[in-house]
């Protein structure tokens, strides 16, 4: 029947009102009841938001998809029922809208169908492109897996370096070289206590020494294990990495703990003690007052607003430990370190991309990388303080602070070789206190 067909006389009405509901039909009919448009038996599930029969569903879909316009010559008051639902398409369509059928549902369905068709056409007409796309996807998945494995390895290094393993150490009886410490990590077992930053008491001279030993041991473990991941096995190369990154690594660890802590004026140590930015530290501390203030300010202004996640911190530590510009690196070690550092960069950016939009991820990556030169500058202050302390305090140089002495020497010795061993042999105190309780 045509769209402008005249309905029968019993379909006409004289009052201007919405199309009446079909007899015995509830507009909120349950699924499987009657069609809310014409009163016919509805299908077993909703169509476009309402219970409708197959005929009304197809009529509504076809009208919306084809953008058809109908005209009613009798005022839009035709009754829509099972017997006469095709008599006036205008009233039938408006009845569909009145009972709640959603036009946007048809448009969404049309878009999905179009996308599926376009995807099928691309697959049929561009087999080469599909193969390349598959290879690209496979490479991306492999790279993502490799990055995840790298992050897991670095997290394990951080966990084992911070864990407690305090056994009797032979360092109480000998003064080994850095080469001995890197070749035989068990020599430092006596100083691998559990690292805890609860900051319950002000650090005195002895607590500063204890924390210093533990932090340097932690840095040694970090550098040694990251070098092994990079396939750098020569001990001299490991020593070069350690000297270049020990101070920045320690400062990053202390800065992160300061930003996490409840106080914004304290630098917590790993033995539950702390130094205050408002108090002058002990004269034998490896951190001078100016460095404490700078570190505290940096932690509160730079680190705290960033809210670094655990994985981001681990990757930042790896970037610091993997310094390809460290003095004394062999060419092979420099190349290996640089390659692993690039992998860490990629893993960090991938991690940021998983949590934010590309622009935000790129901006956050830049903010994180800018932390490294700031740490390096503060690290220079630490090294200068250690050298001055080692020059005028024999207990620091050859007893409690032996590890830092081996790394940086004093103002007369830059500790680039093992000359500090000869110097320590001639200048070590004869008091048995330092030979039995050294470091």
Swiss-Prot record:
Main location class: nucleus
UniProt domain NR LBD: residue ranges: 173-408
Zinc finger region(s), NR C4-type: 35-56, 72-96
Species of the source: Caenorhabditis elegans
Compartment annotation: Nucleus
GO cellular component, one term: nucleus
Keyword set includes Transferase: no
A Pfam family it matches: Hormone_recep
Keywords from the named record: DNA-binding, Metal-binding, Nucleus, Receptor, Transcription, Transcription regulation, Zinc, Zinc-finger
DNA-binding region: 32-108
Recorded GO MF terms: DNA-binding transcription factor activity; RNA polymerase II cis-regulatory region sequence-specific DNA binding; zinc ion binding
PROSITE patterns, A to Z: NR_LBD, NUCLEAR_REC_DBD_1, NUCLEAR_REC_DBD_2
Purpose of the protein: Orphan nuclear receptor.
SUPFAM superfamilies tied to this protein: Glucocorticoid receptor-like (DNA-binding domain), Nuclear receptor ligand-binding domain
Region of interest (Disordered), ranges: 1-22, 112-135
Family label: Belongs to the nuclear hormone receptor family.
Protein name: Nuclear hormone receptor family member nhr-97
InterPro entries linked to this entry: HNF4-like_DBD (IPR049636), NHR-like_dom_sf (IPR035500), Nucl_hrmn_rcpt_lig-bd (IPR000536), Nuclear_hrmn_rcpt (IPR001723), Orphan_Nuclear_Rcpt (IPR052496), Znf_hrmn_rcpt (IPR001628), Znf_NHR/GATA (IPR013088)
Biased composition (Polar residues): 1-13
